[in-house]
């Protein structure tokens, strides 16, 4: 199976990396090298990998916070380093992991800060700016909280506000570092679904770093897989899942990663194999069933069996 590790041609609407190396200068530390990725519109990309693999470093380099150690990043054919800070702020918006403390600002005022690249130093909102703020509040489902103080919101609501602020910048690219890191499970699902919908419906390229591997596979259009001392690979979720890459990239201190349960576990003693003949649309259901390990019995089957299952 082949994955995207080639040099891409420059597309008019793409953010592209060519032979990119990322890391730090003092002292010089290379985190990952020879990165060749192509980020297109209307797609949600999720970067996954173990701790310390370079997910945040890649995001910070793509957004211009860190300089590449080698190679190039281009946006619509223009090298990233050639963008002025003001022009870059109309191209890429960032949502960081840690939410800021803004005790004196309302939700509306926080979202309106996203218009700063267009309003200038004094931040005077024109009628068109106000219309943008109103629209993005509606888009993320937080308009009913517009007059409330930001610090009075739940963590999930605060994250929606920060996403709305990023949308108010009206940039084609939105980068988020662990956007669901401190949220409960229902809120994590809601945020990831929201981002997937925004990317598809608003013609955005959204790039997320995340430790939530199951949700990444559920929502992403493309997975970017990173691990220390391994090449960065990318592919659609089904390709990555069907390969052995998850087990290889997430191996930790000799513990094997279970791609069905998305967790580390003790290796089970195998009985005789059973082949399940199932229609393709039932594959996710069977994978979920296998991950529960309910099929394991104390006495292995006496012979291999074929079990046909129809939808």
Walk through the language-model features, giving the residues of each:
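A short, flexible loop at the N-terminus of ABC-type nucleotide-binding domains that lies
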Residues: 3-17, 21-34, 41, 46, ...
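The feature captures the beta-strand-to-loop junction immediately N-terminal to the Walker
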Residues: 48-50
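Helix-to-loop junction immediately C-terminal to a conserved catalytic motif
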Residues: 63
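Conserved ABC transporter NBD signature motif
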Residues: 71-79, 88
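Conserved ABC ATPase "signature" region
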Residues: 127-145
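Conserved ABC ATPase signature
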Residues: 149-153, 157
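Catalytic Walker B motif of ABC-type/P-loop ATPase nucleotide-binding domains
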Residues: 174-178
């Amino acid at each position: 199976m082949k994955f995207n590790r080639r040099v891409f041609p420059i597309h008019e609407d793409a953010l592209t990396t060519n032979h990119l190396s990322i890391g730090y200068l003092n002292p010089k530390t290379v985190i990952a090298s020879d990165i060749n990725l192509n980020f297109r519109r209307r797609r949600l990309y999720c970067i996954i990998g173990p701790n310390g693999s370079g997910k945040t470093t890649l995001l910070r380099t793509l957004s211009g916070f860190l300089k590449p150690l080698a190679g190039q990043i281009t946006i619509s054919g223009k090298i990233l380093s050639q963008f002025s800070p003001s022009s870059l702020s109309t191209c890429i918006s960032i949502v960081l992991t840690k939410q800021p403390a803004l005790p004196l600002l309302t939700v509306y005022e926080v979202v309106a800060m996203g218009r700063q690249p267009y309003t200038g130093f004094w931040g005077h909102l024109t009628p068109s700016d106000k219309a943008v703020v109103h629209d993005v509040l509606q888009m993320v489902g937080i308009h009913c909280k517009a007059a409330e103080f930001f610090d009075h919101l739940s963590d999930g609501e605060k994250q929606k506000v920060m996403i709305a602020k990023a949308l108010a910048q009206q940039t084609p690219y939105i980068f988020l570092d662990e956007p669901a890191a401190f949220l409960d499970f229902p809120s994590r699902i809601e945020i990831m679904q929201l981002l997937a919908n925004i990317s598809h419906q608003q013609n955005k390229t959204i790039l997320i770093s995340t430790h939530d591997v199951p949700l990444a596979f559920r929502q992403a259009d493309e997975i970017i897989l990173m691990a220390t001392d391994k090449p960065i690979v990318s592919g659609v979720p089904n390709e990555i899942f069907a390969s052995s890459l998850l087990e290889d990239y997430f191996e930790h201190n000799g513990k094997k990663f279970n791609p069905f349960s998305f967790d580390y576990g003790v290796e089970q003693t195998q009985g005789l194999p059973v082949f399940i003949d199932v229609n393709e649309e039932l594959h996710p259901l069977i994978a979920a069933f296998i991950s529960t390990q309910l099929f394991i019995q104390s006495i292995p089957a006496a012979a291999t069996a074929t079990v046909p299952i129809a939808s």
